[in-house]
Amino acid sequence: MEWLYNLFLEHSALQAVVVLSLISAIGLGLGRVHFWGVSLGVTFVFFAGILAGHFGLSVDPQMLNYAESFGLVIFVYSLGLQVGPGFFSSFRKGGVTLNMLALAVVLLGTLLTVVASYATGVSLPDMVGILCGATTNTPALGAAQQTLKQMGIESSTPALGCAVAYPMGVIGVILAVLLIRKFLVHKEDLEIKEKDDANKTFIAAFQVHNPAIFNKSIKDIAQMSYPKFVISRLWRDGHVSIPTSDKVLKEGDRLLVITAEKNVLALTVLFGEQEENTDWNKEDIDWNAIDSELISQRIVVTRPELNGKKLGSLRLRNHYGINISRVYRSGVQLLATPELILQLGDRLTVVGEAAAIQNVEKVLGNAVKSLKEPNLVVIFIGIVLGLALGAIPFSIPGISTPVKLGLAGGPIIVGILLGTFGPRIHMITYTTRSANLMLRALGLSMYLACLGLDAGAHFFDTVFRPEGLLWIALGAGLTIIPTVLVGFVAFKIMKIDFGSVSGMLCGSMANPMALNYANDTIPGDNPSVAYATVYPLCMFLRVIIAQVLLMFLLG
């Protein structure tokens, strides 16, 4: 039976892989079980790790540190890469508001930490450790321990406080989301609603009655007009055609125009009259039945050399006589303007004759199978850049110790930046949704298994000490009170959708486990987008605050 002992107990690379895989498998298996209608999902991996550590399982400390760090990096980088394309646009759609609400969660928790330390007599280093556990923020704990070492103060006690408060930190945010959902959220609030966005693409029909544009080309009219638009079809004398930019408009021409909804009124003035007898934005319109000579087909951009190119530079309309009416990217419908920068995976709705569309298909690629091949080069380059960013020390006035973004902050910021701007420098950042979810789940499982295993050895001894229950109660308060209060204000008073509120609360508490629960129980991507919108700022602030509290109150 020596082989069995070596497999599970003798420290080695093989033993570390076996133990962490076993913990992850048990935790993920339990995560499928629903208790009172609620499943904690991947969070059970953390508790399986605590039990394994309590019963004596351990792995080599260096292997544990590597697996924990690598798992966290994979998770946050993949998350940033996924939400990157919509990250900066989210600031125009409430991102600033979400960050202000997340900031309120951070500051309220910090205030409660100071008050609780003075009210209960718990030392500030212990209280900072409890705060780090309550906010599931191990980078902040590392920063706090480093600060204590530089101040010549014992640095091990915050780790115990963090370990004791951490489980409640994981569950507390989920409980806060559950409480808000139970008492405030109605069934219709969980339905995916189309956002009221004036910039979304809109299809409208116009008839040319403005003498100012009679006998002028579409190109000249577009230069006269500030609102951007695309003329998809032109009806003249009973004949339907796809107009090129040189097409001259005449009185009485009927136009099918794609633009932003906010521009409809201005274009009505430009063309002369809007036809409102047909709703062209309904999803059940048979576009191919509108004109028998033309067909509509969706083509996917799969040729790598097109990544980062402007749509207008391809001159598809002039060369092939087709029209691109809409572009879909990551579930978002974009206006097909000449300035639009193409990304691998974009889905273009092309209208034209069958032969012309076949030619366009060759230009764009439309080889969907090629998109399933993972672009691992970008993954590893991004991880290196993210870790480099996280290692850069930032000097802040009044604080002697430089502050770093760390393992979590650097990679998610680089992931967001590459997801947003990568195609502009012809870097292929496209990853299928299933591949991205696999990376995130793998990274999070590794991270939680290591975290639980590390905390499990002394967890129950600390919990059952006289001050253990007090620490648990304080940690629960630091987790639940700020999230419930801010969540109530965000959802009930500010009328922010429940998915975004949940993601904001998870991001403000740096809690990927709660985010996983939110993603599993709330339709749509709003939780992930909101999480990534507030996570970088909150992570940075948590790391700074952990150091500032100790320096100013103990210095």
Curated annotation (Swiss-Prot):
GO terms for biological process, alphabetical: potassium ion transport
Swiss-Prot/TrEMBL keywords: Cell membrane, Membrane, Repeat, Transmembrane, Transmembrane helix, Transport
GO molecular-function terms, A-Z: monoatomic cation transmembrane transporter activity
Transmembrane segments: 13-30, 35-57, 72-91, 98-120, 157-179, 376-398, 408-430, 437-459, 469-491, 498-517, 532-554
A Pfam family this chain is assigned to: Asp-Al_Ex
InterPro entries reported in the protein's UniProt record: AAE_transporter, RCK_C, RCK_C_sf, YidE_YbjL
Annotated compartments: Cell membrane
Origin: domain of life: Bacteria
Record flagged with keyword Transmembrane helix: yes
Bilayer topology term: Multi-pass membrane protein
GO (cellular component) term, any one: plasma membrane
Protein's recorded name: Uncharacterized transporter BT_1229
